[in-house]
Amino acid sequence: MGIKGLTGLLSENAPKCMKDHEMKTLFGRKVAIDASMSIYQFLIAVRQQDGQMLMNESGDVTSHLMGFFYRTIRMVDHGIKPCYIFDGKPPELKGSVLAKRFARREEAKEGEEEAKETGTAEDVDKLARRQVRVTREHNEECKKLLSLMGIPVVTAPGEAEAQCAELARAGKVYAAGSEDMDTLTFNSPILLRHLTFSEAKKMPISEIHLDVALRDLEMSMDQFIELCILLGCDYLEPCKGIGPKTALKLMREHGTLGKVVEHIRGKMAEKAEEIKAAADEEAEAEAEAEKYDSDPESEEGGETMINSDGEEVPAPSKLKSPKKKAPAKKKKVASSGMQIPEFWPWEEAKQLFMKPDVVNGDDLVLEWKQPDTEGLVEFLCRDKGFNEDRVRAGAAKLSKMLAAKQQGRLDGFFTVKPKEPAAKDTGKGKGKATKGEKRKAEEKGSAKKKSKN
């Protein structure tokens, strides 16, 4: 999920931090890519025409391998040096989110069975994609493939995005590559999105600079992390009634998430009192109305009357007309508004962003090697049923690009200096000389010197 609504918030409030460009502009760059996100993306996107995942004759899924092989070659072909970071053990705080994802997959599975009988092919395909789950086998197969391709692979002790951010901060790579916006929350200086998208989508690479975002939002990194938590992250239950605009407004008004939480909990208490008072008033009104809702009473009269036969008979009882029930007036109560879950350990979530479980970037060595062509043919063609000619052609392209000495980037040789502001002229009136007057004075001075000589 990443951070809910962060992309829109930045595009609206800090647009200068985001820029789109073609992949070829990243030539010569090293990028740490969130492999776990990429596997999930490939399993969903790389499919047959009927919407089913790619499989070999044995029924083994190969969508993830197809995606990694060809899209990595595409990046290398544009002069990019990718390395892939895989997830380790998720933090305990993420357990509830993972449990909900599992529940959603089960719901989608049940829905798919029903859609097969009553729904359209589009409904079935949509529900099938919601059931995608990355397994340990998927991870191991991708690691094996990338190693055979000569691409560096790192297994993070914790979150892959956090390790990508660490490598970017350490200067081992230019940027972190992921679709999850929480990569910025993990303090990655630069985030690249859409790197592993299909070329057919024609999606430009989105480059986001954290320092520019912080500058334009007028926030410290500490405040930015707290803003992201308030927006909604993978570690906590989302807060109801708080969208991106409200979250930013609250952080700007109160300064810290602690004060925001205190403010919202105060509002929640006021709302609870208001609802209770309205309920008490309604109950009182209903009790009052019950007095008018009793059975009609009869009046026994002692009078008599003469009937048509001239006989004296008792007069009928006089009935009281029933009184109408007084309608109970209901007090209007405003909607519940902003709500924070009762158990919402945001301080723990903040620590996971500030001090994630990662390997120090300086301790990691990233090495790009020549691909093992025969190993690729054995694994992809013999085991997984890939076309051998295509695999050999891809390996040859990979070998050529990794062996070639990459052209240096111009921005590596030159430093662009900011333009110095023009000196302010404080001269006034006659004392202020123009450029033309200065030049004439200099010419006169030089003429006098020549005449003396």
From Swiss-Prot:
- Keyword Isomerase applies: no
Q: Which residues bind Mg(2+) 1?
A: 34, 87, 159, 161
**What positions does the entry give for DNA binding?**
47, 71, 159, 232, 234
In this chain, the stretch annotated as N-domain covers 1-105
Record GO terms (molecular function)? 5'-3' exonuclease activity; 5'-flap endonuclease activity; DNA binding; magnesium ion binding
Its post-translational modification remark reads: Phosphorylated. Phosphorylation upon DNA damage induces relocalization to the nuclear plasma.
Main location per the UniProt record: nucleus
Q: Which GO terms describe its biological process?
A: base-excision repair; DNA replication, removal of RNA primer; double-strand break repair via nonhomologous end joining; gene conversion at mating-type locus; maintenance of DNA trinucleotide repeats
- Please list where the region (I-domain) is annotated: 123-254
The segments labelled Interaction with PCNA in the record are 406-414
Q: Does the keyword Membrane apply?
A: no
**Gene Ontology cellular component terms for the protein in this record:** cytoplasm; cytosol; mitochondrion; nucleolus; nucleoplasm; nucleus
Enzyme class, one word?
hydrolase
State the UniProt keywords alphabetically: DNA damage, DNA repair, DNA replication, Endonuclease, Exonuclease, Hydrolase, Magnesium, Metal-binding, Mitochondrion, Nuclease, Nucleus, Phosphoprotein
| Cofactor-binding details, from the entry | Binds 2 magnesium ions per subunit. They probably participate in the reaction catalyzed by the enzyme. May bind an additional third magnesium ion after substrate binding.
Which SMART domains is this protein grouped with?
Answer: HhH2, XPGI, XPGN
Tell me which EC number(s) this protein carries.
3.1.-.-
Record field: compositional bias (Basic residues):
320-333
Describe the subunit structure.
Interacts with PCNA. Three molecules of FEN1 bind to one PCNA trimer with each molecule binding to one PCNA monomer. PCNA stimulates the nuclease activity without altering cleavage specificity.
Q: What family does this chain come from, according to its entry?
A: Belongs to the XPG/RAD2 endonuclease family. FEN1 subfamily.
Name recorded for this polypeptide: Flap endonuclease 1
